[in-house]
Amino acid sequence: MARFVVAALLVLLSLSGLEAIQHAPKIQVYSRHPAENGKPNFLNCYVSGFHPSDIEVDLLKNGKKIEKVEHSDLSFSKDWSFYLLYYTEFTPNDKDEYACRVSHMTFPAPKTVKWDRNM
């Protein structure tokens, strides 16, 4: 009986330890198709490898939040880290700047990654 209690405690401790693991998200910002000025496209922000799952993602145009944004369901990888895809339709040009801003507990402040049309 004592062995069972010890084993049960070890299992509970290991489960609570999983929640304590924190991984910072990797942020990738890219367009669906190669950028051409004046041609409609999709702006994507792929956020992956993060834990815990609480995260806030915004797509930005000239530093302001884009309101009409869609996203995938929250999913997890084999290593139990999470990933998401946020996307919106946009039309590239030479004057507007696009970016993805991510807030996660592993960042001391929100992190913004700019879209590079040459990537």
Swiss-Prot record:
GO terms for cellular component: extracellular region; MHC class I protein complex. Residues 1-20 form the signal peptide. Disulfide bonds join C45-C100. Pfam families: C1-set. The keyword NAD does not apply. GO terms for biological process: antigen processing and presentation of peptide antigen via MHC class I; immune response. Keywords: Disulfide bond, Immunity, Immunoglobulin domain, MHC I, Secreted, Signal. It comes from the Eukaryota. It is found in: Secreted. Residues 25-114 form the Ig-like C1-type domain. Its main location: secreted. Belongs to the beta-2-microglobulin family. Component of the class I major histocompatibility complex (MHC). Involved in the presentation of peptide antigens to the immune system. Heterodimer of an alpha chain and a beta chain. Beta-2-microglobulin is the beta-chain of major histocompatibility complex class I molecules. This is Beta-2-microglobulin. It comes from Pithecia irrorata.
